[in-house]
């Protein structure tokens, strides 16, 4: 509703006007608590200024102006504030609705907003968070502060937490209200509009309003409820209880409550004022009581989330820590740098002086403090940290203390701004002059790849202008991986602000790795507590709390201490030099291990790589198919199989583990066995455990073969093994007989057969006889004279004639004649056996497995077999050695369960030639008899065991 209109009252009788006024007054008196009154019933009245109607009634009207004015003041009107009205507070506000401005004045109105804690259970606690995030128990604080008489006011609870308190009060009038209110009430109304609008707006900025909104949005604990109550100001002031609004709930320097006043509005009834007192912190929540109690015992909430505002001294120190070479301010024992303390698994460097220093270090520090000259006056009040007191205790710290009695400075990181370091390749013997800039002084270091002979420390110290000891420069050891860094100078370089890895003489990691073979102290990755870094831990960047002096003070100190220009005690310098020599010798001992480790590493690396090399010791084949021709192959793969990354390899280290290094028995003309690809030289082949071996040693020895012990019954199904297989030689005719690399892959490429000593000996003599016919005839006559068996042996001439008729003369064929001279891979005749046989040779009639595994069949034997009549059992004439091994070695050992005696081997020498030509003699028998069931011992696996004993005129060691 708006202000009352000022329209003039209509002319009416005086009696009717008086009756209307009395009626209106009675209505207001009978219903004083009505929430509002209709202003329209006052339209006929004005604002207490009535026009004069009758002069006779002027005296009577003058006697009642105050009552009319009070009736106007007691009107209940609104001030354009849209709020919801409710009847809940009708009874609580009855006192202020029925009050009067003169007779029944209203008491002060108190409105409190509080937290009700009645709904909390036993395991729930109401806590408040301070500005640091620490939790405080609210009820405990209220109980501790309740020292006054616990008299509860009406409608209150002792456990309630008051958030806000509003006080609306109408003061007493100074005088009676004037009779003319027409000019005063509009002004009061306008001021009241501003007041109540400000009250409505400001209430939404208070902490209690924000707390209520947050709880409604986050749906907090239902036990935490916000309520309000209306109190009479007169009864509230009589309470003898601690005010729960102003009581502090936690320790702190902040204000608990604040008060805001909306000012005083003057009115004819008295001054009208509104003020509010509220808590500044309303961050309440409900937590578990046990969790709150445990956090107190554990100290989990202590000093948590407390922002540390830097003090003035800290700001001053931070302002000085700018990039550049200007040294920082002095840091004394009383004000150590807490940021310099660090710890690791093996070491811990604390801030301040070393409390656990050894007695020796303490004595040295005391001696230095006594013998040292007085410091400049500017720094005489506080003695800076010395090397012995700031550095970690131990041998390294003791060395650093002796070498540098002056205060140390924090070393800078090893950083080379140029591509080529100008002066870091050799130790400097002459320091730059004092007029030069200190930041241009390079970090002196010594290379670790070549020895550097330094002059004695006394000579070096005598030429110094600054008077520092010789040990303050890096004394590099000869052949040392990383020289021991000396104590850093009293002023740092331009990169002192960089907190990086401590410098080790100015050598970075790349140069250190390249020079020392990755075995230096800085590049080896040794731990800080290991023995390798024991000598450099005393002068690391983070273990020294050095003084941050100005350059001017440094120059003043040089002027004061003229004795620094000449060494005072040469014996101390010599002792330091000797101690440094011991350290260099220890590092040199590790340097000597580099060559042996590098040689072993290179050898193992070369054996792991399958690369072709003309000087390597791995094996190659000359007759392999074109796809892998000349490639280095493994013992577990066939020559025609492509080499894969998973193919086993033979190490390049000469040892007995080279399982397939075969010996060459020829003496510049005789060829037996296989040769290594590295050259015509090879090693002798050890056979069994017997000491008898045919050794023809070549000029050089590269590898030793691992022998295979003889077995009575070889395993029928044996997996391929790279250590037990032999290399198969490939001849030219094999590509014609077995095209397209038709080989079996069910088993290994080939398997080593179990040969005896006599077999190796006969095999060697057989090839010698095939190469030299004269030696063959002599050997035949010697064997014929010693042989006493009934077997009739053909003459050498007949045997040679038969071989020539078949175009397979063993001694004159192009293949064998050339193989005796330049064929590097001669076939080890009889070393192959078909699947399931007794270790015999291959059989052309035994299926594709035997054909594929036939491998190296000599040409003269192949052509001789082609002339036969197609008998399946007579196709195997691999060589006489294989037939002799099957007929003698296998049958005798299988029947008698022991190998033949060496004496029997000597007696049975003639059988070598008899068995070699037995296939040819059997052909003449078969041509004459047409189907005689006798067969040679070199037949297929079906006839080797069944028809071997049916040869007329022949028996085995009868």
UniProtKB/Swiss-Prot annotation:
MF terms in GO: protein kinase regulator activity
Region (Disordered): 1-64, 304-534, 618-730, 769-910, 922-958
Pfam family, one: ATG13
Residue ranges with Low complexity bias: 378-409, 469-494, 516-526, 718-729, 775-788, 840-852, 871-880
Location(s), subcellular: Cytoplasm; Preautophagosomal structure
Compositional bias per record (Basic and acidic residues), positions renumbered to this chain: 328-338, 665-675
A single GO BP: protein localization to phagophore assembly site
One cellular component (GO) term of this entry: autophagosome
Keywords: Autophagy, Cytoplasm, Protein transport, Transport
Family named by the database record: Belongs to the ATG13 family. Fungi subfamily.
Protein name: Autophagy-related protein 13
Natural source organism: Aspergillus fumigatus (strain ATCC MYA-4609 / CBS 101355 / FGSC A1100 / Af293)
Lineage: Eukaryota, Fungi, Dikarya, Ascomycota, Pezizomycotina
Record gene name: atg13
